[in-house]
Amino acid sequence: IAYASALAFDLLGEEVEKVRVFLSPNIIKNVKSVVVPHTGGERGIVAASAIGICGGEAEKQLNVLSSVTQEDIERSRELRRRVDFQVERSVRDYIFSIIIEMEGKNNSSRVELAGNHTNVIEKRRNGEVVFSKPYEEKSDTHSTDRSLLTIHNIVEFAESVDIEKVRETVERQIEYNTEIAE
């Protein structure tokens, strides 16, 4: 969301007056209460979009927020107070869909991502397409082979694994899940 918002803001080229965020249902579910990286605990969809606008560096893609400053965080809080943010379900039926629309005083922009966090499939400025590429959701996007995830196999793995080989991964997951739960 932050990446798409940073792209849309760059495309807009002026102060933001309105933001519409369209997301596929699973993204809404997963992001609505998650901590936004590099924000000191800011949470949710609107926070992710606002910090992308105020401190995001779109050219860094997944690291879009890696250089966020405290000043950027304060500006994003002010932006959320001042600007109308609307969050809606995406018009696309994709498993992964993010569409950001922005309006300024004189311009508008729209950025669409599909399939994954960095797959930009369309950019528009003032209604005109400035970038477009075809996207077709593959049927295997909808399912992952989980046939090995039986209770028996999970218990067997847990009882036999060398904990030192998985400690870092498990501790990281505990940290992430704790942040989400808080």
Regions found by a protein language model. Name each.
Residues 1-3, 40-44, 48, 67-74, ...:
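Conserved active-site and cofactor/substrate-binding residues in soluble primary-metabolism enzymes
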Residues 7-10, 51, 179:
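Charged/polar positions on well-ordered alpha helices
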Residues 18-58, 77-83:
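A structural-propensity feature for long, helix-poor, extended segments
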Residues 42-62, 91-109:
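C-terminal domain-closing interface element
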Residues 1-14:
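Alpha-helical support elements that line or immediately flank enzyme active sites
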Residues 16-19, 96-98:
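Residue-level recognition of the N-termini of beta-strands and the immediately preceding loop/turn
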Residues 60-84, 164, 178:
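Glycine-rich, flexible loop motifs
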Residues 80-182:
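Signature of multi-pass transmembrane helix bundles
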